[in-house]
């Protein structure tokens, strides 16, 4: 394969991995531990 093909596949999979991890962090089981600064600062 050409270098450009390998590089584009690598960058695409890296972006997909980061997106998947951020969605899992935001909505997965670990989201219960996240703090919400807007709820802490209600008056």
From Swiss-Prot:
Keywords: Chloroplast, Membrane, Plastid, Thylakoid, Transmembrane, Transmembrane helix. One of its GO terms (biological process) is photosynthesis. The keyword Plastid applies. Disulfide bonds: none annotated. It is a single-pass membrane protein. GO terms for cellular component: chloroplast thylakoid membrane. The chain crosses the membrane at residues 5-27. It comes from the Eukaryota. InterPro entries: PSII_PsbN. It is found in: Plastid, Chloroplast thylakoid membrane. Belongs to the PsbN family. May play a role in photosystem I and II biogenesis. This is Protein PsbN. The gene is psbN.
């Amino acid at each position: 394969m050409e270098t450009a093909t390998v590089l584009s596949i690598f960058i695409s999979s890296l972006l997909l991995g980061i997106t998947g991890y951020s969605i899992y962090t935001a909505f997965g089981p670990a989201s219960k531990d996240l703090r919400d600064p807007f709820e802490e600062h209600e008056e």
